[in-house]
Amino acid sequence: MLLIHQAINAIGELVLALTIPFLWWLIVTRRQVRFDRWLGFFLPPVQRTWLTTVIVVLFTLLLAIPLPLIVDHGILATFVFNHRGFAGIPAALVYAIVGTSLPEEILFRGFLLKRLQDRFGFLPANLTQAICFGAVNGLLLAGAGNWLVTLIIVLIEMVIGYCLGWLNERRSGGSLYTSWGIHALLNTVSALIALFT
């Protein structure tokens, strides 16, 4: 039942995340580029500077992995996986790969960052999408009661969002696959921690 619930949620979140970008593309740039490429769904070029990329990936992992260990599980989205063990792995993977990371990457790095970057340049665009990414994640925790924990999570999410945007645009030629893979990995680890704690 949990797997079906997560699959339905994932489809709903994908539809929501794709609606505004699709309408924008349909009205503004439909004749110039395919929708999937416009969002960044293409293979990244071969990396020549792996060391920098690996350092940024490790940095984001070090920021994100402790969160489910230090925050009350009841306020995190992964709460539904608490103590489910191996039986919850399929649902956790749907949640992590399709239900959260893909819609968020489409909306923040595929749409917001790329559209703002076209108009204002990389730095203001990446800062803006990172702030929005952190703020949205903070809004989801706003009712948790502990404003300090919420603020820390928002700041960590902003830094992670900035790093993911930087990796996409500066190291992956605008491909969304890099940040989606990292984001899915982070969410999978968080869900696995919930499954077995």
Where are these regions (language model features)?
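Functionally important transmembrane alpha-helices
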Residues: 150-197
